[in-house]
């Protein structure tokens, strides 16, 4: 990268998460200079239906970006990158929002990633055993786009399906709004739509599942022009978008990433040299990036394709060009912790106590656990309390939407101690789920020696330590906590031409903050917890079988 001495260089990263838009100004060293966040609306008209508005999201992107760049010389801003959740955006033939609901509310034109309305449709898709399913862990998830498209065709044919003109993954919608070019990203199409880099779309798949009309016009509705993440799209930032965002016209705009993949990009390239960590020279393929927020995604990369049952992929060049990606995940993690804590009868007491001390509720709970642990490790407080965390189905490695949450060991207690212990057991369950995914990936051929954590839950020291203790692996935290935003900015840096490749940009812009090591003396305890954890799963399947015989 060529740069004049003293010249300021910045990239803008825009991250559209589940509940908010965040924008950061990031320099060429990966330092977040400024960032602003704004919430976005979520509608839940009925259980398992989650909807958003593309107009609302774009307006938030514009408002927040203007705030972030307001004090900077536009000439210093060299590239723009987007990431977003893998939600489905529906537009009509005039590129206007089209309702994805029976109420006809056109503003609500997004089926969110966590929407599970298409359960029947995904079951039928999986029964086809089509060859494309081999690249999604053998079983397609209800959170992917084909079952959602099929649901729209079968439930809103006249109102929505027949009127649709463009069907975007949210990250691609954002780059279209910025550039006027509806080119899609390899990341979105490969990971969520069954696109193959080698063969493109598979006509036989869409025809077999009843979506033969998707093939019309050379797949014009879902994308027939595709680019690698970080490549500069079209004619760059349009005059209209530049005015709305407060950025210079003609600014390079990168092909996008899904938010979890941006997190992986922002954290997994950080060098471990000089940290005294065993295996510091191990390749990037020995690292598992864990992006943990509302849900969690587990990103493992390899030089050759590895097929892992129940784990999405292998996807070629979906995150890092030239490397294969496997993506495990848990559909509810941060959302699960909130659900458990907010639903406890002692929650009001917790809120009052935390407020009186000027603390966040989770900071207070962590401190409270330290107070009640007595002489043993904190984790041992949950020796008799066990949680199976699939309150929103199992994404990996069971790939089973029918799985439900379980709690074993409840008492009549209404105390704050009881709430704190349940909170601890829930975090342990999430970490045990990570171990389950990790061991499945290892068995299939991955060799993981280090976890790299980012996302909102990585700010919680208890969550981080439990992942280290339960997996037995060191956990690397990024110097920049907001690694997803850094990942989006890395895309912009690549689009600008300042870096010749994503790999080089990752190495320069990703930095280690600290490393958390496991308490190996607690291994026997967590091995026993893991044994119970696996029994909870097998027992639940037994219960389903018993009740299914009625």
UniProtKB/Swiss-Prot annotation:
GO terms for biological process: pentose metabolic process. GO terms for cellular component: cytoplasm. InterPro entries: ATPase_NBD, Carb_kinase_FGGY, FGGY_C, FGGY_N, FGGY_RbtK-like. It is an enzyme of class 2 (transferase). Its EC number is 2.7.1.-. Disulfide bonds: none annotated. Keywords: Kinase, Transferase. It comes from the Eukaryota. PANTHER family: FGGY CARBOHYDRATE KINASE DOMAIN-CONTAINING PROTEIN, RIBULOKINASE. Belongs to the FGGY kinase family. This is FGGY carbohydrate kinase domain-containing protein. It comes from Xenopus laevis (African clawed frog). The lineage of its organism: Eukaryota, Metazoa, Chordata, Craniata, Vertebrata.
């Amino acid at each position: 990268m060529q740069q004049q001495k003293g010249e300021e260089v910045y990239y803008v990263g825009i991250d559209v998460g589940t509940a908010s838009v965040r924008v950061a100004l990031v320099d060429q060293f990966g330092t977040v200079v400024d960032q602003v966040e704004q919430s976005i609306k979520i509608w839940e008209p009925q259980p398992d239906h989650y909807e958003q508005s593309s107009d609302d999201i774009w307006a938030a992107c514009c408002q927040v970006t203007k705030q972030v760049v307001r004090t900077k010389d536009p000439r210093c801003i060299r590239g723009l990158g987007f990431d977003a959740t893998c939600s489905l955006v529906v537009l009509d033939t005039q590129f206007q929002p089209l309702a994805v609901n029976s109420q006809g509310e056109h503003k609500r034109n997004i089926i969110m990633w966590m929407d599970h309305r298409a359960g029947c449709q995904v079951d039928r898709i999986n029964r086809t055993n089509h060859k494309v399913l081999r690249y999604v862990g053998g079983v397609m998830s209800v959170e992917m786009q084909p079952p959602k498209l099929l649901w729209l065709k079968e439930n809103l044919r006249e109102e929505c399906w027949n009127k649709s003109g463009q069907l975007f993954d949210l990250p691609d919608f954002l780059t279209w709004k910025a550039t006027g070019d509806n080119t899609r990203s390899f990341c979105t199409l490969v990971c969520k739509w069954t696109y193959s880099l080698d063969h493109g779309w598979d006509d036989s798949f869409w025809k077999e599942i009843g979506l033969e009309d998707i093939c019309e016009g050379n797949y014009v509705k879902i994308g027939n022009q595709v680019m690698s993440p970080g490549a500069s799209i079209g004619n760059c930032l349009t005059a209209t978008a530049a005015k709305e965002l407060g950025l210079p016209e003609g600014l390079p705009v990168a092909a996008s990433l899904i938010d979890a993949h941006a997190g992986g990009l922002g954290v997994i390239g950080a060098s471990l040299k000089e940290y005294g960590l065993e295996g510091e020279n191990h390749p990037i393929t020995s690292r598992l990036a864990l992006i943990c927020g509302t849900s969690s995604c587990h990103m493992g990369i390899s030089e050759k394709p590895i097929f892992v049952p129940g784990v999405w992929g292998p996807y070629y060049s979906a995150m890092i060009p030239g490397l294969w990606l496997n993506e495990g995940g848990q559909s509810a993690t941060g959302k699960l912790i909130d659900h458990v804590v907010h639903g406890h009868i002692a929650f009001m007491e917790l809120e009052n106590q935390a407020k009186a001390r000027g603390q966040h509720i989770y900071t207070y709970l962590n401190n409270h656990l330290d107070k009640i642990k007595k002489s043993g490790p904190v984790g041992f407080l949950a020796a008799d309390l066990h949680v199976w965390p699939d309150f929103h189905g199992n994404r990996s490695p069971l790939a089973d939407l029918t799985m439900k949450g379980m709690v074993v060991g409840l008492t009549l207690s209404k105390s704050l101690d009881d709430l704190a212990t349940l909170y601890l057991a829930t975090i342990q369950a999430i970490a045990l789920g990570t171990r389950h995914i990790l061991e499945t990936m290892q068995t299939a051929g991955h060799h993981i020696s280090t976890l790299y954590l980012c996302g909102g839950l990585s700010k919680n020291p208890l969550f981080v330590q439990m992942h280290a203790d339960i997996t037995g692996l060191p956990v690397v935290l990024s110097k920049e906590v907001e690694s997803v935003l850094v990942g989006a900015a890395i895309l912009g840096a690549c689009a600008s031409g300042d870096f010749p490749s994503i790999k080089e940009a990752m190495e320069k812009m990703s930095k280690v903050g600290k490393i958390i090591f496991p308490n190996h003396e607690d291994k026997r305890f967590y091995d026993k917890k893991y044994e119970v954890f696996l029994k909870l799963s097998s027992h639940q399947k037994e219960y389903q079988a018993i009740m299914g015989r009625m």
